[in-house]
Amino acid sequence: MCSSRCLLFLATLAFLIHLSLARATPVSTPAQCLAHSQNLLRTTNHMLEKAIQTLKHYPCTAEDIDHEDITEDKTSTLNACLPPELAKNESCWASGKTSSVTRGSCLPPQKTSSMMTLCLSSIYEDLKMYQTEFKAINAELLDHNRKQIILDENMLTAIDELMQALNLNGETRPQKPSLEEADPYKVKIKLCILLHAFSIRAITINRVMSYLNSA
């Protein structure tokens, strides 16, 4: 009798622990992913405006910088995330690509396709690359100890939150920052270049999430 009661107690305890963990683990929805992307766009634009104002004696405006896309030839976002009405030969193009991460829960079942899955995976890789670059630059800015400008933690948090929503399995690829110069001037110029490029990518990401959240 005691043995049966012990087994029943352990089974009940295990069930309650499992239920507690399930409730404690937040699961994103397309609507939440859209909210994350809107927050990303808002915080990125705020950081870009702050950089242009703070670094007014640097070539930091869109007209002055040398535009650079650090994701060029490394991710498929620009091709995979085309609006459906513009995408042609979707199955043929996407069949030769591989997805390194799961789509998380940003992609609703009714809009699942190989191209859209690749699009979300590419967005995740974009975010990972920019996150690595921004963290490296922020470390340099802090090391210079002039506190003229540092990255907004709200933007870095927004990047991390959207990455978590896109990658529920927690799979990551190691990234190495391209920043090599420790010269304060070059670091600030690099910051401006990255912020302009990332603000454009944030617009694309927000458009994709808006489409996935539409009826």
Swiss-Prot record:
Keywords from the UniProt entry: Cytokine, Disulfide bond, Glycoprotein, Growth factor, Secreted, Signal
GO terms under cellular component: extracellular space
InterPro entries cross-referenced by the UniProt entry: 4_helix_cytokine-like_core, IL-12, IL-12_alpha
SUPFAM superfamilies linked to this entry: 4-helical cytokines
Transmembrane segments: none
Principal cellular location given in the protein's record: secreted
GO biological process, one term: immune response
Subunit structure: Heterodimer with IL12B; disulfide-linked. This heterodimer is known as interleukin IL-12. Heterodimer with EBI3/IL27B; not disulfide-linked. This heterodimer is known as interleukin IL-35. Interacts with NBR1; this interaction promotes IL-12 secretion.
Protein known as: Interleukin-12 subunit alpha
Originating organism: Sigmodon hispidus
Gene: IL12A
